């Protein structure tokens, strides 16, 4: 079974770079305090690293 991580959006995406908004959508985040579980892959880690200032990660 793949390892999963919990990602929570902590800040708004309004006024952010379009690439960062797309990263949030790719992670499945829609609003502040929305939490999703995603697989721990290099692809998702890259998206999380790009928007690190808007999300909180729990291993």
From Swiss-Prot:
What InterPro entries does the record point to?
Answer: Ribo_uL30_ferredoxin-like_sf, Ribosomal_uL30_bac-type, Ribosomal_uL30_ferredoxin-like
Q: Which Pfam families match?
A: Ribosomal_L30
Query: What Gene3D superfamilies does its record include?
Result: Ribosomal protein L30, ferredoxin-like fold domain (3.30.1390.20)
> Keyword set for this entry?
Ribonucleoprotein, Ribosomal protein
On whether Cytoplasm is a keyword of this UniProt record, the answer is no
GO MF annotations in UniProt: structural constituent of ribosome
- Transmembrane stretches in the record are none
- Assembly information from the UniProt record: Part of the 50S ribosomal subunit.
- Family, per entry: Belongs to the universal ribosomal protein uL30 family.
PANTHER family per the record? LARGE RIBOSOMAL SUBUNIT PROTEIN UL30M, MITOCHONDRIAL RIBOSOMAL PROTEIN L30
| Designated name of the protein | Large ribosomal subunit protein uL30
Q: What is the lineage of its organism?
A: Bacteria, Pseudomonadati, Pseudomonadota, Gammaproteobacteria, Vibrionales
The primary gene name is: rpmD
């Amino acid at each position: 079974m793949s390892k999963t991580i919990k990602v929570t959006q902590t800040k708004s995406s309004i006024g952010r770079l379009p690439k960062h908004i797309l990263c949030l959508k790719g992670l499945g985040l829609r609003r502040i305090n929305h939490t999703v579980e995603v697989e721990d892959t290099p692809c998702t880690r890259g998206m999380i690293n790009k928007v690190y200032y808007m999300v909180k990660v729990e291993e």
